[in-house]
Amino acid sequence: MSQPLRAEFEAIQGRWKELCRNGHLPARSDFPAETMTPWMGHIQIVERVGDGDSVRHRVRLVGTRIVYYEGRDNTGLFLDDVIPIDQRDEILEPYRRCADSRAPVYNAFYSCSEAAISSQLERLILPLSADGKTVDQFLVAIYRAGT
């Protein structure tokens, strides 16, 4: 990532980097709730389900600020079920890129929810792995751009 990141992204990415050891990715369990307090409302956990062409992304946890930005709570839902078909590639591509590269991915986007606030959002996607190698979850921080 070449562009400068907002301070919150720098901090959470710094924590993620500290937990990457010997080429292994951190696991979800490396981020207990009490260590996530500064970012709690802006955190989303997304699970990678399946493999190959059948990979889907299920939302496991959604912070309260993200619910506000999106205008709904997507906990337990698959992203491809809530994203309009004409926007799926744009919204899901950063998750694929993050899983393939095993590296953080930043992007800016507009929510596709009709109930969402009408402003640009920024997202940092960090890969997580229970075995240290295979990406099985993502720690996602989402903030309103320009705030």
Model-derived features: positions:
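Intrinsically disordered, low-complexity terminal regulatory regions
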Residues: M1-I85, D89-T147
